[in-house]
Amino acid sequence: MTAAALAEIAAFFGLLTAAAVPLGAYAARVLSTAPPHGRGPVARLERGLYRLAGVDPAEQMGWRRYAAAALTFNAAGLLAVFALERLQAALPGNPAGLPAVSPLVAWNTAVSFATNTNWQAYGGESTMSHLTQMGALTVQNFLSAATGISVLAALVRALAGPAGSGLGSFWVDLTRVTLRLLLPLAAALALLLAWQGVPQTSSAAARWPTLSATAASPGAEQVVALGPVASQVAVKQLGTNGGGYFNANSAHPYENPTPLSNLLEALSILLVPAALCFAFGALVKDRRQGWTVYSAMLAILVPLTVATVSAEQRGNPALAALGVDASPSALQPGGNMEGKEARLGPVDSAIWAAATTAASNGSVNAAHDSFTALGGLWPLWLMQLGEVVFGGVGSGLYGMLLFAILAVFLAGLMVGRTPEYLGKKVEAYEVKMASLAILAPSATVLLGTAAACLLPAGYGAVGNPGPHGFTELLYALSSTANNNGSAFGGLAASTPFWTLLTGVAMLVGRYWVMLPVLAIAGAFARKRPVPAGPGTLPTHGPLFAGLLVATVLLVGALTFLPALALGPVIEHLQAVPR
């Protein structure tokens, strides 16, 4: 691994921290429970929306009502996306004349975008009309992200509030996060991307003569798909959505044309999840809590990013055994260039891969299926940790707080004391709910992979033999059950078996985590804060950060090490010359 690669990794995380701290302070103000004041256009729009919808901005919901509102809203969004997909052939905004999306793919896509997964069993530019891309998918990118942040806000209020406090109003949280946080960020990023060359147009396609035109075929031309790309790419990155306008996602030069656009998009993957760590510290009135969680996330992500970059820069061991020179030099980037854009190279591709799988983003600027065995292992494991290393906007942090609850419970067992977190006692109910939320996605991954290995409809969709084929199955279930959305491209994901299986996995991974989190929030909201005593475990500082990291890694290792040994580990050992 070169010094330049290490410097790039250090600069990337330095820029992330510098941007996340002030954004976190702003996000904390957005998530405060005070009614909207002021005469600005956003405040007036917010109050108008509340009046139109009959929402009381001062309402304090219990956890069941908050959950019912979130589920109802998400179900309505799912049905709206499905309807637009099925009717797009008869609707305007379809200059390419694309037909209706097939029922199973439409259902899978609607579930995918409602759950913030953005798993794509279709090619964007060849399947979805402009209206569907804008009115269904881009809108859901905002709303699914806002849902995750709203649930996080409810949990944090329960931890920070007095006994008997409510969780706030889901409708108010959803509106504020969308209008005051996601829309301004996405608008700014979309303008920057358009400046860099990302299209934002209502035109269907451009036609260009090809370089291979001959006297026999002088009219040979290439049809280049266009559309409202910049607006969708901006929110797909900031909202940890990940679904690309084009089938090649951010490897496509119209989604990611320049080194600057690549940096902006990669930083945007982690920006909001990182900022929410600092918002958490501000909301609980102890900034050390936010820094502790953020440090724990970095302590996992940075080494795994280095490991991914190192694996890709070393190249394929099977080719090295044949004498292929894959060393970085002044004339070549070196490493494993299969499946990568020549303008980006293995380092930028590997940094993106680590970031997109740490967050539940899933966008790609390279083909993950073409990574080396070890280069694909670390992004796969980052997803299997539960998408809590930054994770999705809102969902990543509330997932990490579940591990924090589990960590203080384990520490309490070791010293024989009732555990506490932020002054609220952690009892059997909270531990059961946290365990359910942590285990549900993992069980879905393992059971789904087992079913795919046993049924011809499952393993028949695999495009590669041996351990790599098994890794394709494992990656697909790990991605969908943890709401990531990236994929190993060798899997035929649009078959009926896989559209149904991944759709169910996405629903379980989203709502079987969200509902226990809200149940925990309801339990904490009823509890009186307990003053810290001499035996209270401090939940800030290096000691607790280390305990939190150990808990996350222990659960991830015990759950998935056998499966990983059957896939990428064996694949790597097979490639190493004997």
From Swiss-Prot:
GO terms for molecular function: P-type potassium transmembrane transporter activity; potassium ion binding. The keyword Transport applies. The chain crosses the membrane at residues 3-23, 67-87, 95-115, 136-156, 181-201, 264-284, 291-311, 396-416, 436-456, 504-524, 543-563. It is found in: Cell inner membrane. InterPro entries: KdpA. It is a multi-pass membrane protein. GO terms for cellular component: plasma membrane. Its main location: membrane. Keywords: Cell inner membrane, Cell membrane, Ion transport, Membrane, Potassium, Potassium transport, Transmembrane, Transmembrane helix, Transport. It comes from the Bacteria. Pfam families: KdpA. The system is composed of three essential subunits: KdpA, KdpB and KdpC. Part of the high-affinity ATP-driven potassium transport (or Kdp) system, which catalyzes the hydrolysis of ATP coupled with the electrogenic transport of potassium into the cytoplasm. This subunit binds the periplasmic potassium ions and delivers the ions to the membrane domain of KdpB through an intramembrane tunnel. NCBIfam families: kdpA. Belongs to the KdpA family. This is Potassium-transporting ATPase potassium-binding subunit. It comes from Anaeromyxobacter dehalogenans (strain 2CP-C). The gene is kdpA.
